[in-house]
Every structure is written in structure tokens, then in C-alpha cells.
Amino acid sequence: MCILCDSAPALTELKIDIKAASLDQPEVIALITALNADLIERYPEDGSNHFRLDPEEVAPGRGVFLVAYVDGHPAGCGATRLIDPQTAEIKRMYVVPEFRGRGIAGRVLEGLERHARSLGARQIVLETGERQPEALALYTRAGFERIPLYGEYIDSPLSMCMGKPLHA
């Protein structure tokens, strides 16, 4: 089985399944490794300060890690976790380059927002950066707006935070 495919199916052939996954699954490890490499390439001066995700943060009742599968191949991922009873945070959003531009990130984001609502969150926030124009475009299309830096990102000059209310 291909962990991260070399060739993506044509757009007309896409069958996207979004499934909850644990952080120790081989395809999750491969996706996170690829995401980390992408972030290090975009932000070499930042090291890997913000690249962690504790399994407890995505444990049932606290969050979820979702994987998008296209025709059975892992194509993207994302996580959400509660940072307080009213606020969920999006983490670890990534789509394999061969699958980008096909709506996969939007499907993962929708699933994460649904899960955040199910946990009782009234708003959702995230951290990204200006060197991720595709992420900024996705989040803007999804209704996110810039917010002040928060939490571990307060002193990060490379960070850009966004958020939006979650309606029932």
C-alpha cells in the first residue's frame, strides 16, 4: 500500500473519505512527517517549535485527528482540540502536494468544525503564516478572519492567527 502516493487520481475519479485516526497509525505518521518537512522548508528560521501534537489533545471528548483518504490513499489531515470549553483550535492541516486543489482541505476543515461544535465549542481558532498562501485562501473562504496572536504564538513574529464563531 502506498503511504503517500506518487500519482494522484484524476479529479473526476476522486472518492474522498474522511475518517478519525490515531496519531500512531503509519499513514498519520507519514502525513505529519511530510507536514513538518513542508513547514521547515517554508519557515527554516522557526525550527520545529510548534510542530507538536499531544495524543491526549485529540483524545475522545477533547478533540479529533482526521485523515482524508482518496481512493484508499491518505491525501490530507487535520486536527482540532479544545483549548477551553468554548474554543476549539485547528492543528496540523495538510494535504499531500499531488492532491492539492481538489477540495480535500475544505472537506477536512468542515469535518473539524463539525467535531468542534459537537464538543460544545462556540468559536474556532488557528495559527498559520503568510508563507502559506494556500492555507490563508482556504481559511478566508471558510469565513475565518485575522485575530490577535494567542497562546504559544503571542511572541511569534512569523505567526498569523485566525478565528470565527461556530454556529449551531
Where are these regions (language model features)?
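Ala/Thr-enriched low-complexity intrinsically disordered regions
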Residues: 8-12
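C-terminal "cap" of GNAT-fold acetyltransferases
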Residues: 13, 21-24, 31, 122-125, ...
